[in-house]
């Protein structure tokens, strides 16, 4: 139904290029909201199917992050944000899910950054685990919200989320992916000069069943 709605809206707009500005604005809003609902539905389906994903692939993180940077460069360039990578590591897990986890963290750091800021992904490999730090130069997250940001549909700044089309599911999915791999994610530090999110993951593929996210 959502795909049909999107197609019908696009067709109507294409067939009526001379519609009044008020109508065009209204239809544009409808398209934005339909797309947002479609993305929300897709993410919820992904979250419900996480347990079925195989997690036995060997993953080298630095090349993966470089690919993520390539995908997100157009978004970063809009605000003059530089993307930086430090370190590398190898782990066993789901390549697709780890990609999505780091992508979501990096995308979030870009969206809520300051103009001409920077985002750094730092990977540290230890004998038994990996530490992935994603740091930005944004305005920071108030301390009272630092536990809540991993809850589904939670948004610190609703006006900026509307601007970027966020539904408040990106970090909830990050939490679920980390937990599914036997790891964790948290706000390592945050101030008015920026935020660092830390994801800690075991390097081995012996993942236990993911603990339930009590915020869900």
Functional labels for PLM-detected ranges:
Residues 141-155:
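Short conserved segment of the HATPase_c
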Residues 109-110:
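Short helix-loop "hinge" at the ATP-lid/N-box region of the Bergerat-fold HATPase_c
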Residues 182-183:
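Conserved glycine-rich
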């Amino acid at each position: 139904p959502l795909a049909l709605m999107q197609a019908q809206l696009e067709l109507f707009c294409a067939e009526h290029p001379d519609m009044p500005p008020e109508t065009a604005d209204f239809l544009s809003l409808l398209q934005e909201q339909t797309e947002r609902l479609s993305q929300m539905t897709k993410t919820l389906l992904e979250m419900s199917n996480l347990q079925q994903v195989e997690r036995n692939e060997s993953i080298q993180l630095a090349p993966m992050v470089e690919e993520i940077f390539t995908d997100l460069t157009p978004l970063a360039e809009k605000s003059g944000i530089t993307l930086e990578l430090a370190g590398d590591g190898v782990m066993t897990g789901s390549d697709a899910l780890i990609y999505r986890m780091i992508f979501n963290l990096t995308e979030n750091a870009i969206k809520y950054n300051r103009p001409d800021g920077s985002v750094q992904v730092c990977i540290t490999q230890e004998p038994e685990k990996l530490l992935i730090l994603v740091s930005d130069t944004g305005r920071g997250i108030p301390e009272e919200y630092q536990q809540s940001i991993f809850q589904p549909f939670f948004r610190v700044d609703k006006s900026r989320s509307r601007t970027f089309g966020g539904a408040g599911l990106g970090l909830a999915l990050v939490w679920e992916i980390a937990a599914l791999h036997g790891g964790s994610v948290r706000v390592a530090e945050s101030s008015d000069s920026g935020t660092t999110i830390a994801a800690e993951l075991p390097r081995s593929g012996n993942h236990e069943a993911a603990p339930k996210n009590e915020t869900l």
